[in-house]
Structure formats: C-alpha cells, structure tokens
Regions:
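Acyl-thioester C-C bond-transforming condensing/cleaving domain
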Residues: 2-3, 17-48, 58-67, 72-202
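Conserved PLP-binding active-site segment in aminotransferase class I/II-type PLP enzymes
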Residues: 4-9
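Short polar catalytic/cofactor-binding loops
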Residues: 10-15
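Short glycine-rich or small-residue beta-strand-to-loop segments that form or flank ligand, phosphate
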Residues: 52-56
Length: 202
C-alpha cells in the first residue's frame, strides 16, 4: 500500500551568471545552505530526515562526485540517512523529486529531501594524459563543461535538440511561441507578487 506524499517546503538559490559572484563558491557549500534552509522551512528537525536525493549533471569540485552524501552531512542530516545521486541530462531536478517521492510512497522513507545544483562556472579542465605521462606530442586541456552541453552520441549541443525535433515531428512555431509567452507571463506574475522572492534563500 502506497503512502500519501506531501511537499512540506521548497527553496532555491538565486540564479547566478556564468563567471559571476557565485563562481568561487563550491557547489556542495551552496547546496548545503539551501538544504538547511529547506529543513528549517519544513518545520521538522534535520535529524527527522532519512533520505536525500541529489542531482548534478556536471560535478565541479572534488567533493561533488558523491554530492548526495556530502551535502547531506554538511546540512546536518543523520549519518545513517540514505543518500542517492541522480545523473540525468535535462529534467534531473524533477527526477530527484520523483525518486524522493518513490522512497516515501513505498514506505522506505518518512521524510525525504530532493535537491540539485549546477555550478557551470566551476567546471574544470582536464589533462587526460597526465596520470601516466605524455611521451610525445601536445598535451591538451579538455573543457569538461563542453561535455555537459553535448550529446555523447551525436556530439551535438543539447540546445540543437529543439531544431531536430521540429524537423522530425513537424512542430509549428506559433504554438511554441504561445507556450513560451505563457511561461514568461507566469514568471513575471511570480516575481511581481513576491512568490518567487519568498522561495529564494539569500
């Protein structure tokens, strides 16, 4: 028998610019501040939570490869709480929410947190030949951010997907523009009413 699921709180950080004021802040630090704020807003104690689902598609710091555990510990969640990392390109935040909901629905968790973060400003460069030495030729720095944007199969940028789908399925521009306008109008209404501002942790 599945359990009823309720959302107790929601919070987000401010959106930063690429190379902006947040560029020197490790992703797990920013994420843990947001999770702590979410716990506080929920009215529950950090010790009450038994699971954290965390998603990031582009690990940017040495402690972000298992971000769920690191963020959970930095946020004051119990050491024996579950920690699950989700890696899904596009809609990963929604996938984290679904995974946390499944934990509760199946009775495996009582209180769970779904969280995620991307810090593209901190994406590293890699020298893949440096570990065993470069016998000859040039060493090349690989921009790991580039691989966060590209499809690993076609090597196309994921932003090109819209054009590809339009060509394949014959989508028309007008309905998409209407949908985009509706989204912008909703965003403006959320900003003007203060709803969005109340969600942001300074």
């Amino acid at each position: 028998m599945t359990q009823e699921i309720y959302v107790a709180a929601g919070v987000r950080s401010a959106l930063g610019n690429f190379g902006g004021t947040l560029k020197d802040k490790p992703m797990t630090e920013l994420a843990s501040e947001i999770v702590q704020s979410c716990v506080k807003r929920s009215g529950a104690a950090a010790s009450d939570f038994d699971h954290l689902v965390f998603t990031t598609t582009c690990p940017t710091d040495k402690d972000s490869l298992f971000a769920a555990r690191v963020v959970g510990m930095k946020s004051g969640l119990p050491a024996d709480a579950g920690a699950l990392d989700v890696s899904r390109a596009c809609a990963s935040g929604l996938q984290a929410i679904l995974a946390a909901g499944q934990q509760i629905a199946t009775g495996h968790s009582h209180l769970a947190i779904a969280a995620g973060s991307e810090m593209f400003s901190r994406a590293p460069f890699a020298v893949t030949t440096s570990r065993w030495g470069q016998a000859r030729g040039h060493q090349q720095l690989e921009d790991m951010l580039e691989w966060c944007y590209r499809c690993p199969f076609s090597l196309e940028y994921m932003g090109d997907t819209a054009e590809n789908l339009t060509e394949k399925y014959g989508y028309e521009r007008a309905p998409m523009d209407e949908y985009a306008l509706q989204s912008q109008e909703r965003a403006l209404a959320a900003i003007e009413s203060g709803f969005l501002g109340r969600q942001i942790q300074p």
